[in-house]
Amino acid sequence: MSQANLSETLFKPRFKHPETSTLVRRFNHGTQPSVQSTLDGKNVPHWYRMINRLMWIWRGIDPREILDVQARIVMSEAERTDKELYDTVIGYRGGNWIFEWSKQAMEWQQKACQETDPQRSGRHWLHASSLYNIAAYPHLKGDELAEQAQALANRAYEEAAQRLPGSLREMAFSIPGGAPVTAFLHMPKGDGPFPTVLMCGGLDSMQTDYYTLFERYFAPRGMAMLTLDMPSVGFSSKWKLTQDSSLLHQHVLKALPGVPWVDHTRVVAFGFRFGANVAVRLAYLEAPRLKAVACLGPVVHALLSDSQRQGTVPEMYLDVLASRLGMHDASDEALRVELNRYSLKVQGLLGRRCPTPMLSGFWKNDPFSPEEESRLITSSSSDGKLMEIPFNPVYRNFDTALKEITGWINHRLC
């Protein structure tokens, strides 16, 4: 499709699509406590979505660009689902969250197409991909406009990967009983097979959100990174998240001996937030296939089993959980009962001795992941390492933590 036609298709106003905040209809909407965390951002008054500035900046978005897009959304006088929430403009038009972030992404996509230097063009494509991902955030099931933005994010990511250092391969893995899934294998310079980090991302992120992790931390150490979307989103959208949360990653892990670029004898799993649920499950179920497991702000028990803690997290995050579980119309009580089944302690795993070395990093007073969560993980391992990460300065401490975790992973892979 030509650039002009793509623009016309993208930015033609459409009003029949449901607005994101209406997709999950839970019944007990309460008052919203103030929440701020490094990995999830903060719930800012008058916004439905959590504003995750740190992670967006970490992925390469300029803070001024974030403010510019937010300003366009705030200034819109278009009809909203909720007059009190800026990012609930109805229809695909000016002021709508998905429209404005996609419009910003298109500007970078056009720059990428016009740039003759492959390296700079690749950077612009990567920037566009990150912006399209923000447009699709928080990736709720049935959000048609967000799914279109996600498709554009994936396309931009593929374009970026062709131009940036290292090598990227898009790989299909067959999963018994359902559709195959697509993963991205990021390889550093040099000859493989490479020691590999299997990324297990959070429920509100996509596999294309982690290029920075590969480029800054893993690639310099000669490690490859294999990413896979969590069940129910992105390339794994045909799979529903179940209590067997590690199902997709487990099948991919088992298939690695057949991937010539991966040294399947040197694989580590790294989980962010709910991705740690997947990674720690793998530590128990696939111990012979993993050298180690690292977690950051894990969600493996407390948030899944403690109704008081669930009451302190923002509306959007509960909507994400309900969406992933396919419980779009569930009451909070029904959601709590189901979430409890996802606790690895309730499942009888955590608390039992695990032979896999496990590291877990935490922030004090993290509303999503208390210190006890990380202690439970590391004390269950025969070789556990607990890492406390100071909150301020946020960006520097996040970078330092990732460097330390990468060093620990590298040591386990040697």
Swiss-Prot record:
Gene3D superfamilies xrefs: alpha/beta hydrolase
Family matches, as SUPFAM superfamilies: alpha/beta-Hydrolases (SSF53474)
Reaction catalysis annotation: a carboxylic ester + H2O = an alcohol + a carboxylate + H(+)
Keyword Hydrolase: yes
EC number(s) recorded for this UniProt protein: 3.1.1.1
GO MF, one annotated term: carboxylesterase activity
Record-linked Pfam families: FrsA-like
Alphabetical UniProt keywords: Hydrolase, Serine esterase
Keyword Hydrolase: yes
Similarity remark: Belongs to the FrsA family.
Function: Catalyzes the hydrolysis of esters.
Designated name of the protein: Esterase FrsA
Organism: Citrobacter koseri (strain ATCC BAA-895 / CDC 4225-83 / SGSC4696)
UniProt gene name: frsA
